[in-house]
């Protein structure tokens, strides 16, 4: 059994931390039944994963993609362009309709201050000691 070291793999994967992540992910894949690309030689899954990386029987870029997909909680979905899909609220309206015709009631500063004067602050509740 040949000993696999980080130096055997570091020229294939530049960062040691990435190497550990990729090897661990590959070892989990092997544990879940993924096909081996080299002979096991009575080695455990992490050693087999490192040997596969060192012998370049698997692509580190493919492993990185698989790792990212396995860690994603939400799958990205390409949304259709907004100009090709009509808006939900505009069933009878055309796509080119101008949405700036929203009626907004304007309030002057004096009206706002009069409204605020009518508001009373909430009553303070006495704190209970335990």
Swiss-Prot record:
Domain of life: Bacteria
Single GO MF annotation: DNA-directed RNA polymerase activity
Catalytically driven reaction(s): RNA(n) + a ribonucleoside 5'-triphosphate = RNA(n+1) + diphosphate
Entry keyword set: DNA-directed RNA polymerase, Nucleotidyltransferase, Transcription, Transferase
Chain spans, region Disordered: 79-98, 108-130
EC number(s) stated in the UniProt entry for this protein: 2.7.7.6
GO terms of biological process kind: DNA-templated transcription
Record-level GO cellular component terms: DNA-directed RNA polymerase complex
Enzyme class, first EC level, given as a word: transferase
UniProt function note: Promotes RNA polymerase assembly. Latches the N- and C-terminal regions of the beta' subunit thereby facilitating its interaction with the beta and alpha subunits.
Record family assignment: Belongs to the RNA polymerase subunit omega family.
Assembly information from the UniProt record: The RNAP catalytic core consists of 2 alpha, 1 beta, 1 beta' and 1 omega subunit. When a sigma factor is associated with the core the holoenzyme is formed, which can initiate transcription.
Name the UniProt record assigns to this protein: DNA-directed RNA polymerase subunit omega
Organism of derivation: Nitrobacter winogradskyi (strain ATCC 25391 / DSM 10237 / CIP 104748 / NCIMB 11846 / Nb-255)
Lineage of the species this protein comes from: Bacteria, Pseudomonadati, Pseudomonadota, Alphaproteobacteria, Hyphomicrobiales
Gene that this sequence comes from: rpoZ
